[in-house]
């Protein structure tokens, strides 16, 4: 059996993997052991009490984190006429229709979010095999297919994150960076949990928020007492 490194032993001494920590303490521990030479993201994993195999229990949505994500997102918008001008005024980085679709088909995808007005979906629909696997396909369920493209752009720029439960019933998300103070990370996680609560399927029975854990990009995971997450 290999010996534990000094760092692993220190983590083992300070973090009990079976203990539920108050949110502020959990975040403090994650930040303490996030020692990479870059500003690590602070991530969360939420185990939901749903059956992800059932179509009526797929949890999906979007939420604007009140304190942002620490990352500036580039936004592409499919719109024309007045809607295109509204998108540009709201801060969209790329706006187009057939010309934007041609760039995407050519492999030029210098953006993190794609938004579309409903009338543009005839064009966007042809890009499903390109955008879909990358998680970029616009969808009305997360507010990225909408006649109000300006608000969608502003939300994306303000720190909106999308979430979707995986096959194991877990939602993964990022709530900020190590450089964020604890209060901002707490506020962002509370907003995400509130959005998950609102997205609870009517057919879900029993405990809905089963487990919550926070971690950093290269660091350790710490379990959170859900009773300490104030929405």
Curated annotation (Swiss-Prot):
GO cellular component terms listed in the entry, alphabetical order: cytosolic large ribosomal subunit
Stored SUPFAM superfamilies: Ribosomal protein L1 (SSF56808)
Pfam family, one: Ribosomal_L1
Keyword RNA-binding: yes
Gene Ontology BP, a term: translation
Domain of life from the UniProt record: Bacteria
Keyword Plastid: no
An MF annotation (GO) of this entry: structural constituent of ribosome
Keyword terms, alphabetized: Repressor, Ribonucleoprotein, Ribosomal protein, RNA-binding, rRNA-binding, Translation regulation, tRNA-binding
Entry similarity comment: Belongs to the universal ribosomal protein uL1 family.
Quaternary structure and interacting proteins, as annotated: Part of the 50S ribosomal subunit.
Record's function text: Binds directly to 23S rRNA. The L1 stalk is quite mobile in the ribosome, and is involved in E site tRNA release.
UniProt-recorded name of the protein: Large ribosomal subunit protein uL1
């Amino acid at each position: 059996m290999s010996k534990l490194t000094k760092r692993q032993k220190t983590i083992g001494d300070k973090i009990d993997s079976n203990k539920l920590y108050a949110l502020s303490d959990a975040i403090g521990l994650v930040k303490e052991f996030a020692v990479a030479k870059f500003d690590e993201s602070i991530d969360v994993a939420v185990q939901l009490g749903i059956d992800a195999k059932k179509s009526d229990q797929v949890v999906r949505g979007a939420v604007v984190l009140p304190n942002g994500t620490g990352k500036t997102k580039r936004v592409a918008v499919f719109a024309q006429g007045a809607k295109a001008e509204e998108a540009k005024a709201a801060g969209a980085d790329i706006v187009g229709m057939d010309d934007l679709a041609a760039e995407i088909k050519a492999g030029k995808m210098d953006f993190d979010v794609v938004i579309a007005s409903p009338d543009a979906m005839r064009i966007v629909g042809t890009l499903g095999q390109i955008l879909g696997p990358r998680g970029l396909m616009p969808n009305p369920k997360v507010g990225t297919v909408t006649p109000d493209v300006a608000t969608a752009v502003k939300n994306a720029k303000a720190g909106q994150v999308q979430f979707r439960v995986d096959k194991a019933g877990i939602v993964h998300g990022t709530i900020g960076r190590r450089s964020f103070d604890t209060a901002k990370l707490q506020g962002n996680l509370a907003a995400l949990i509130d959005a998950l609560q609102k997205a609870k399927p009517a057919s879900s029975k029993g405990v809905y928020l089963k487990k919550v854990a926070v971690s950093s990009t290269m660091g350790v995971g710490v379990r959170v007492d859900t009773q300490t997450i104030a929405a």
